[in-house]
């Protein structure tokens, strides 16, 4: 347990909320079961960002699902990371792809998908979806299949 506490700098400590996009707050820890294929899912119902053109707030539920390999994302760091989008100007599709790419850089998962369920503005709701499967593996094929059969 001491080793795990040394790996993580946010959990169990006073929280500083970043006011702009801050991928550096993401932290990972070792997966105790990298030989197993299993889902880890996060549902983040209070995501906010800003429209890069109007500066108006956008609200969404962000859903993150992944098959971990050696590393896993620590949930408090993920919460703080997602909060850092609060004053960040980005289109919905950009937010989803940025989140996915940052998590790939952090963990190098076998497979990951991120969905944004954005609250309607102007009578239109946008639900961007992005996924990734590790190249050259069955997870790459899985990503293609899931993308082609998405909704």
Curated annotation (Swiss-Prot):
Transmembrane segments: none annotated. The active site is at 51 (thioimide intermediate), 58 (proton donor). It is found in: Cytoplasm. GO terms for cellular component: cytoplasm. Pathway: tRNA modification; tRNA-queuosine biosynthesis. Its main location: cytoplasm. It is an enzyme of class 1 (oxidoreductase). SUPFAM superfamilies: Tetrahydrobiopterin biosynthesis enzymes-like (SSF55620). InterPro entries: GTP-CH-I_C/QueF, NADPH_dep_7-cyano-7-deazaG_red, QueF, QueF_type1. One of its GO terms (molecular function) is preQ1 synthase activity. One of its GO terms (biological process) is queuosine biosynthetic process. It catalyses: 7-aminomethyl-7-carbaguanine + 2 NADP(+) = 7-cyano-7-deazaguanine + 2 NADPH + 3 H(+). Pfam families: QueF. Keywords: Cytoplasm, NADP, Oxidoreductase, Queuosine biosynthesis. The keyword Cell division does not apply. Its EC number is 1.7.1.13. Coiled coil: none annotated. Belongs to the GTP cyclohydrolase I family. QueF type 1 subfamily. Catalyzes the NADPH-dependent reduction of 7-cyano-7-deazaguanine (preQ0) to 7-aminomethyl-7-deazaguanine (preQ1). This is NADPH-dependent 7-cyano-7-deazaguanine reductase. The gene is queF.
């Amino acid at each position: 347990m001491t080793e795990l506490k040394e790996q993580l700098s946010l959990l169990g400590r006073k929280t500083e909320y970043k006011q702009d996009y801050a991928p550096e707050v993401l932290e990972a820890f070792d997966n105790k079961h990298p030989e197993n294929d299993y889902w880890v899912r996060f549902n983040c119902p209070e995501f906010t960002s800003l429209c890069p053109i109007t500066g108006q707030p956008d609200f969404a539920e962000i859903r993150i699902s992944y098959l971990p390999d050696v590393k896993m994302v620590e949930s408090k760091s993920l919460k703080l990371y997602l909060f850092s989008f609060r004053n960040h100007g980005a289109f919905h599709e950009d937010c989803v792809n940025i989140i996915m790419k940052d998590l790939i850089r952090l963990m190098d998962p076998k497979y990951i998908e991120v969905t944004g369920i954005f609250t309607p503005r102007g009578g239109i709701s946008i639900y961007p979806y992005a996924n990734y499967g590790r190249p050259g593996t069955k997870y790459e094929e899985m990503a293609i299949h899931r993308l082609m059969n998405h909704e």
